[in-house]
Amino acid sequence: MRTTDFASLLSKYLLSYLPCQRGVSDNTLASYEAAFSRLLQYCEEERGLPVRKITVETLSPDLIEGYLNWLCEKQKNSASTRNQRLSAIKAFFKFTRRENPRYIYACERILQIPTKKCPTPVLRYLSYEEIKEMLEKPNPCTEKGFRDLLILCLLYDTGARVSELLDLTVGDIHFGRYARVQLTGKGNKSREVPLSAKTADLLKNYIQRQNLSSPEKQTQQLILNSQGKSFTRAGITYILQKYAPDGHKKITPHILRHTKAMHLLQSGVNIVYIRDILGHVDIKTTETYARADTEMKRKALEQAYPTPVPRQGTWQSDSKLMDWLKSLSP
């Protein structure tokens, strides 16, 4: 194999296949790039293997497993991050197997590497009282306060990922017979999520205040920071932290997403609808919320048939039985 084959395959995978054919998001692409950047770093620093000498066969199971161990032990990555890196590598080898069947054996060996079991993280979410407290904190009479309130309401009302919020354009908001927002999620898959009347009113007011109703503004980003630039994830997280309910040190956009899902579930919304609102591909992902809600489990048990335990009688002493038991002792 020529020394340029690996570089050629990796370039085609990252620059053409993932963004153009698969249509992955920028965040997914960045994650895949990080996986291979770290792998090349490991090869050079730990194995003394220059990038120009790396081939498909060079990336043996032993080398990949060494890389994964290096991530956990030296780089202090979590088991979850380790598994994400492995997933990116496996996806590349599936691509390589399809592009060049000559390397099917080398690819299959990598695909057999198992993921590492990791503890199930505690699902953090806010109660209805806490989300109410949070939404009451911004001052809607100021420009920043109004914008911040809109951000909080959109994240909670739609259950959107932070990347979906940041990608929203004016044209993604629809006010017809019922208000709704079009979100673009993982794999560039779009979905429409209904908006509550109060969030819709906030949006109408915001669009009017910002002069965003003209046709030429439809492709403009909906929410910008004070400098008129795109928000970053860190910027949105900072806003959430500023209005965090009492007793919560760290609030992230994903906690609001979890909160919306749990509140829908607790309100009796069918889990299939919750899956569609959140944009999950696999309903098993949505079922995580059902497993996490201990209060719902308790109520379900209370509503079920009671365990038919018979009434316990009163123990009556039997002198003959006691005498017989004593006779068994030496």
Question: What name fits each language-model region?
Answer:
Residues M1-P330:
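Conserved catalytic core of the tyrosine transesterase superfamily
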